Amino acid sequence: MEPKVSVGILWNKKITFILNEAYLYEGQETSGENTVSFNDGKIVWNGSAYDELYFEPQYKDASFTIKDVVIGINFHWERKEDQEFQGALKLIVENETITAINIIGVEDYLTSVISSEMSATASLELLKAHAVISRSWLLAQIEKNREIIAQEEKYTTFIETEDERIRWYDREDHVNFDVCADDHCQRYQGITRANSNIEIVKQAIEQTRGQVLKSENKICDARFSKCCGGIVEEFQNCWEDTKFPYLVKLRDDDSTQDIPDLTQEQESIKWIHTRPSAFCNTQDKKILSQVLNNYDQETTDFYRWQVVYTQTELSELAYRRSGIDFGTIQELIPIERGTSGRLSKLKIVGSKKTMTIGKELEIRRTLSESHLYSSAFTVDKKDDKFILTGAGWGHGVGLCQIGAAVMGEKGYQYNQILLHYYIDATIEKLY
């Protein structure tokens, strides 16, 4: 039987939504524009206070619109837009604010994710591959959440001492729903964007209905990112120290060349400062447009890129982004790298404080107004400037979306694409 998923859409003191067709609240029919506000630990709606509200669609195709949903949170493309959703709407109180949650069947959720994460102009094989990994990742997260709750132990994603801050970003925020709608989980925008070439997306979902990746009899935590930069990263270098047999280093091409050991600094420098052949090393706009939505295409350099800061800019930025007063930053010293060359530990040497930070997303957040494209970068100092030369976009674990798009164009079938990125996994039908 197809499961349902609860998706966190928006957090705000005040939320305006429109029930576009008839919805039921405690058996009473309601529709039209509504506004709820947070007051004294309750949700205020139509003059009354509630702990939570649940609106059930009266008809299968009924939809609701939430105004001013923030997309691309903390990324360079952050913006607000009105978004339309099918399924049920649940409103709860969480952290002194109101959270809007969409409850919907997994396959309908996937239809939106595929057209939100990828352009719907992608090849059918790429869309099918993405359907399987998105379904696998989602069901693995739901299972992981149950395990965390059952353990009763606090799920730790933060380790800080006097001279070290190690943090990873994964499940820590989501207690009252399964996943969020932003890039923190999987980009989900309801049926807002699910209208463009929707038939091929539905075809990809239907042809892979219920299919997931499995390894050692468990659903795979099938991670993916925009561009690995030529070599895929391993899970434990980005999140908790758990090694998965299907999320291991591999070269993103069809050659049998040796994989350089990018945990070694000199090998990383050599790799990042060249453009080795890889599926994801492409400038083909037709292929890129399959993966990158319009707001993603504001970025064009991702296989190899460069960012330059003055010493003053870097010092002020790191203080503002991390809250740590390093003083004037004198050195950025790579301490530990993963298999793709991504830094998992970086020492920041300042006139007031020296501290090692990690993992990859903490490094990316500290050294950018939003996020550096990746933590696979080298550091060169020239006069008062710090030059960061980097590779790839995202954490680099699992499927490389641009690499997979190139494979689809080259004629690879979806199962071949999946088994290239997820080593020794199997594809199985759950329902």
Predicted regions and their residues:
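Conserved, single-site charged/polar hotspot
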Residues: M1-Y431
